[in-house]
Amino acid sequence: MLASKMRWEIQRPDQDKVKSLTEQLHITPLVASLLVKRGFDTAESARLFLHTKDADFYDPFEMKGMKEAADRIKQAISQQEKIMIYGDYDADGVTSTSVMLHTLQKLSAQVDFYIPDRFKEGYGPNEQAFRSIKERGFSLIITVDTGIAAVHEAKVAKELGLDVIITDHHEPGPELPDVRAIVHPKQPGCTYPFKELAGVGVAFKLAHALLGELPDELLDLAAIGTIADLVPLHDENRLIATLGLERLRRTNRLGLKELIKLSGGDIGEANEETVGFQLAPRLNAVGRIEQADPAVHLLMSEDSFEAEELAAEIDQLNKERQKMVSKMTDEAIEMVEQQGLDQTAIVVAKAGWNPGVVGIVASKLVDRFYRPAIVLGIDEEKGIAKGSARSIRGFNLFESLSECRDILPHFGGHPMAAGMTLKAEDVPDLRSRLNEIADNTLTEEDFIPVQEVDLVCGVEDITVESIAEMNMLSPFGMLNPKPHVLVENAVLEDVRKIGANKTHVKMTIRNESSQLDCVGFNKGELQEGIVPGSRISIVGEMSINEWNNRKKPQLMIKDAAVSEWQLFDLRGKRTWEDTVSALPSAKRAIVSFKEDSTTLLQTEDLRREVHVISSKDQAKAFDLDGAYIVLLDPPPSLDMLARLLEGKAPERIYFIFLNHEDHFLSTFPARDHFKWYYAFLLKRGAFDVKKHGSELAKHKGWSVETINFMTKVFFDLGFVKIENGVLSVVSGAKKRDLTDSQTYQAKQQLMELDQKLNYSSAEELKEWLNKLMKQDSEAYESTRRT
């Protein structure tokens, strides 16, 4: 058995709706099933989703505040006022800034941009920045991807005579800033049809309004910010992402070309993963390490030399960010382990930790421990701790932190993520309170991650063609993630570790008609918990592996499970003790039927764990449900093994079977051996077995055990009698078959057991042991005979 690490949530779609979509849209049942599950269960909604490019953008002037904003900006341009774009330091922020900068430059505006320093100024507009902007002669500020919470700063701007236009997409608070115009789809009174635009999406709509036509040349920037900011990829966001990725593949932006080249990507093959894993992390890294201005300069650059230099600088900053995150994560993990793994919520803090990457570290702690996690960087000079939090399903982080408002002067966020600032001296109190809240909120089940399953399919369903069809639903992202498929009860054909450090795993699974490769990155430990021949279920993402111009389907493993017990065949393996040592001690049950077998274990701790089974009652009473049974040596009888296993439900059985040369006869006497020995006894008349048995054995090339065994068989059958240790033939004894002897029967069964245990294949052994575990008395007798 191999337990899944996650809770698999399987929601099977309405098959009538699947059939209807399949027939009306001429798509495969696999694609139709996913559309139904994603909520596109009518032909009209599904067709629109699949053919997003045929849709139209909404009129930007449907958004509240758009006309006022456009009019004021056009007035500033016509009067040659200086306009400042006030942006944010993440990928959404820098693309928003670039979209607005490009638009205003195209309109010949006097324009510049300002992005606050994350470390000195923090997020959003600030009073000092506004005063500085005013002193530099600017009369209009346009915020992008920020500003909706800048109530105080708006008052300062008004006092200074600065006009402010806010474009944002973050949740509006109860009080909105008093400014010239607010362009925000979620503001009260806004009837814009789509509310989930990213910051760059709102900026793109303003650009559309200002230019009087759809700014196609800005779609690549809009797509990058939209995908990077993890907003839902449906409706207008899906249109932006789809058309924007097409534009990105043929972009003329020198900076983007250089950055993708440095990341090892191909601009002509760019997709949502290119943005998510290559562009976004690098654009985000700039503002995490230093001021974000170089990211904007990169996106705006029209000089190839400058673009190359900026891309190299940004790529280097990303490498620094990766090293920083790795170091901080290692330190944070060590802290968590020192604090104790019994905590229901994690709060770690350290002086010198970069506040720009604490959110990434918090996410990694959640991945590692699956607990709500807060990671704080401490500024010792100011005595404050600043950080980020990430949560798990079932724990509302924002509500929980709201209960700690008295020690959190600054915090904000939503149920799954938050940011905060507090006094460094209050960190222990925050840890204590958050753990108490989590203790009272979370159940044991909540600490098991949830894996949603989109589709249940067979091995034969995953083909190059079906994966290509599934890509009709791309680009994938929030609310339209790459589908996770479940392949149930396939046969595991092969499993092995791969990679330079053997940290990854590759499997081959099959059913009656097809086979499929499965790859799990950083899942090398799976190899130790499964054996070929097992029935395995795997949840993963479908992908195409292309090598030497040959395409093959594969499944990227997210989780795996084996519901049946497994047999690990370690007979004759030299490294068996290493394998046994690596098993979790809480599950390990080492069984021996001979006391001296324990001496063959090199590890003292393992020797102390051995359970020596010496009676059938002891074997029957041994609780092995859920255990990893390690059988060190063969049982003395089939009955003993049956009593050990019948009715039990172990998860695994490890066969070691260290052989002892005295355990079984080296040879089983043939009938001719018995004939010769009987004739010998008739001729001798009397024979002292103890005194002369070894001489006879040596003369015949037999073992002493062979002589003793044949003697006991003759005694069982009444052929001989023993007086004072001397053996003599009984005259007139009734003729009987050797198999009538209980001694002969027992040894015959033991020899058959020896053959079965030592020479059967692992598959044959497992089938046979299954009978022992499930048998009733009638089945037991049947097992004895087979």
Curated annotation (Swiss-Prot):
Residue ranges of coiled coil: 300-332
Annotated GO biological process: DNA recombination; DNA repair
Keyword flag Nuclease: yes
Record keyword Coiled coil present: yes
GO terms for MF: DNA binding; single-stranded DNA 5'-3' DNA exonuclease activity
A Gene Ontology cellular-component term: cytoplasm
DNA-binding region ranges: 485-563
Alphabetized InterPro entries for the sequence: DDH_dom, DHH_sf, DHHA1_dom, RecJ, RecJ_C, RecJ_OB, SSDNA_exonuclease_RecJ
EC numbers on record: 3.1.-.-
Pfam families listed in its UniProt record: DHH, DHHA1, RecJ_OB, ssDNA-exonuc_C
Knockout-associated phenotype: Cells lacking this gene show only slightly increased sensitivity to DNA-damaging agents. However, cells lacking RecJ and with a mutated AadAB enzyme were extremely sensitive to these agents, as sensitive as recA deletion strains. The doubly mutated strain shows 10-fold impaired growth in the absence of these agents. A recJ deletion suppresses the lethality of pcrA DNA helicase depletion and increases survival of the strain in the presence of H(2)O(2) but not methyl methanesulfonate, although the surviving cells are very small.
UniProt enzyme class: hydrolase
Highest taxon in the source lineage: Bacteria
Keywords: Coiled coil, Cytoplasm, DNA-binding, Exonuclease, Hydrolase, Nuclease
UniProt subcellular location: Cytoplasm, Nucleoid
Subunit-level organization: Interacts with SSB (sbbA).
Annotated function: Putative single-stranded-DNA-specific exonuclease. RecA thread formation during DNA double-strand break repair requires RecJ or AadAB.
Family: Belongs to the RecJ family.
Protein name according to UniProt: Single-stranded-DNA-specific exonuclease RecJ
Upper lineage: Bacteria, Bacillati, Bacillota, Bacilli, Bacillales
